[in-house]
């Protein structure tokens, strides 16, 4: 890889012969109720949950460290999901991994458990680097490390992202008492820390990119990742994960990998979400607000996420909803970092049931109570549609997704989505639908 010029710290998160395993032939997952990780730092690590498991194999059969096995039991996990079953046995032994599996099947746990299994913490040395595209996702991954390392008191994890003072990161890194063994970061901030020689990555043994297609498809972000990658040893494990991996992005991913295990759980053409009901409704642009209010009145839901195309529309729609007695919160990339994280936590902790968001919440964010996703503004990309609606119906639980179609461009995108994922999206019936089709018992 050629050495790229140094760039200023950028914000990315709000964008307005290989071993191959074909897991698509495996048995269909059973639909088990599930909950995702709660914020470990808030003392919610004892919440119980279960990934959609289809194998009689238990996590105990992976022969993990006793400390890890105990944390897994505390979380209520017994059987691995399909992607975990196919990946963990080799990833814990240092094999490079390229993994595509639909939203909600526990990809995060694959690299969290695999890296913790291999970790032998040395004070002051960074052993694991995890890169992701969004600050909220970095925060969430950090919390997964916290809950699975709860019985590994010597292990320290830190998260670094833009929008916070870099001198605070520097202070944490230079103090051996606080220096992390595991770093979760967005590319821009980590590149800046490397550039300014504030972090030493010469001891890294595991290099992970989550949502790798999003991280590597943008040239500026890819350059930052390359600079970070060059600061790590040549001999290390590299793992990449995403819900979508197009044929075009796979060769770019493979440049970072050596003889990888390639896992594709469900063929790309069939990236459907078990238990998720998908509909569209045709309307004029000026009818969207009335229709949204009607849906929020008529539908039964725990929490709903409403996707819009811009920060301005997010703010305006949230204001309108609150004025109409629909208490709502908004999250987008243009608000101050502390406010954004606070709102994310408030929504996750069920302080509000309605969240209006740009695509900053469109990838990887796990909030287990969301069972309704509404595309107020339909995305322009088929892959992004999957990431958006994947916020509902996580881990095989039921959910409902409704997309507003208000223009010929929207109709064209809807057609591409159905063709891309080999799925039929029906028009939402005027009389509504039976709540039992999208609500768990």
Swiss-Prot record:
Entry's Gene Ontology cellular component terms: spliceosomal complex
Keyword RNA-binding attributed: yes
GO terms for MF: ATP binding; ATP hydrolysis activity; RNA binding; RNA helicase activity
Compartment(s) where it occurs, according to its Swiss-Prot or TrEMBL record: Nucleus
Binding site for ATP: 101-108
Subcellular location, principal: nucleus
Any Gene Ontology biological process: mRNA transport
KW ATP-binding (keyword) present: yes
Record keywords, A-Z: ATP-binding, Helicase, Hydrolase, mRNA processing, mRNA splicing, mRNA transport, Nucleotide-binding, Nucleus, RNA-binding, Spliceosome, Transport
InterPro entries (alphabetical): DEAD/DEAH_box_helicase_dom, Helicase_ATP-bd, Helicase_C-like, P-loop_NTPase, RNA_helicase_DEAD_Q_motif
Domain Helicase C-terminal: 291-436
Function: ATP-binding RNA helicase involved in transcription elongation and required for the export of mRNA out of the nucleus. SUB2 also plays a role in pre-mRNA splicing and spliceosome assembly. May be involved in rDNA and telomeric silencing, and maintenance of genome integrity.
Protein name: ATP-dependent RNA helicase SUB2-1
Designated gene of the protein: SUB2-1
């Amino acid at each position: 890889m050629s050495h790229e010029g140094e760039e200023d710290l950028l914000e990315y998160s709000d964008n307005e012969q290989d071993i191959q395993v074909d897991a698509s032939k495996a048995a269909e997952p059973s639909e088990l109720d599930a909950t995702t990780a709660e914020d470990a730092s808030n003392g919610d690590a004892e919440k119980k949950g279960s990934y959609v498991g289809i194998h009689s194999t238990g996590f105990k059969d992976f022969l993990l460290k006793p400390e890890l096995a105990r944390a897994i039991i505390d979380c209520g996990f017994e059987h691995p999901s399909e992607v975990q079953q196919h990946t963990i046995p080799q990833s814990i032994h240092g094999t490079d991994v390229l993994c595509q599996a639909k939203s909600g099947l526990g990809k995060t746990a694959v690299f969290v458990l695999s890296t913790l299994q291999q970790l032998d913490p040395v004070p002051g040395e960074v052993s694991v680097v995890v890169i992701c595209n969004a600050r909220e996702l970095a925060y969430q991954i950090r919390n997964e490390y916290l809950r699975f390392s709860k019985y590994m008191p010597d292990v320290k994890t830190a998260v670094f992202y833009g929008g916070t003072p870099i001198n605070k990161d520097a202070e944490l890194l230079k103090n051996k008492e606080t220096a992390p063994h595991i770093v979760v970061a967005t590319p821009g901030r980590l590149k800046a820390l490397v550039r300014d020689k504030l972090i030493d990555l010469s001891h890294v043994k595991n290099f992970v990119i989550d949502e790798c297609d999003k991280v590597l498809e943008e040239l500026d972000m890819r350059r930052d990742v390359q600079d970070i990658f060059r600061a790590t040893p040549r001999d290390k494990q590299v793992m990449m994960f995403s819900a979508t991996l197009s044929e075009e992005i796979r060769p770019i991913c493979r440049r970072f990998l050596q003889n990888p295990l390639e896992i594709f759980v469900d063929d790309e053409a069939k990236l459907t979400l078990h238990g998720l009901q998908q509909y569209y409704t045709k309307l004029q642009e000026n009818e969207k607000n009335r229709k949204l209010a009607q849906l929020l009145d008529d539908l039964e839901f725990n929490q709903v996420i409403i996707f819009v195309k811009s920060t301005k529309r997010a703010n305006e729609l949230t204001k309108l909803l609150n004025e109409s007695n629909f208490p709502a919160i908004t999250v987008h990339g243009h608000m101050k970092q502390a406010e954004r994280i606070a709102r994310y936590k408030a929504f996750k902790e069920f302080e509000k049931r309605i969240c209006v968001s740009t695509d900053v919440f469109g990838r990887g964010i796990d909030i287990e109570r969301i069972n309704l996703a509404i595309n107020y503004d339909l995305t322009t990309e088929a892959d992004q549609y999957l990431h958006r609606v994947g916020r509902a119906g996580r881990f095989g639980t039921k959910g409902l997704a409704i997309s507003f179609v208000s223009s010929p461009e929207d109709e064209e995108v809807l057609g591409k989505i159905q063709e891309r994922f080999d799925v039929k999206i029906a028009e939402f019936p005027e009389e509504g639908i039976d709540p039992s089709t999208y609500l768990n018992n």
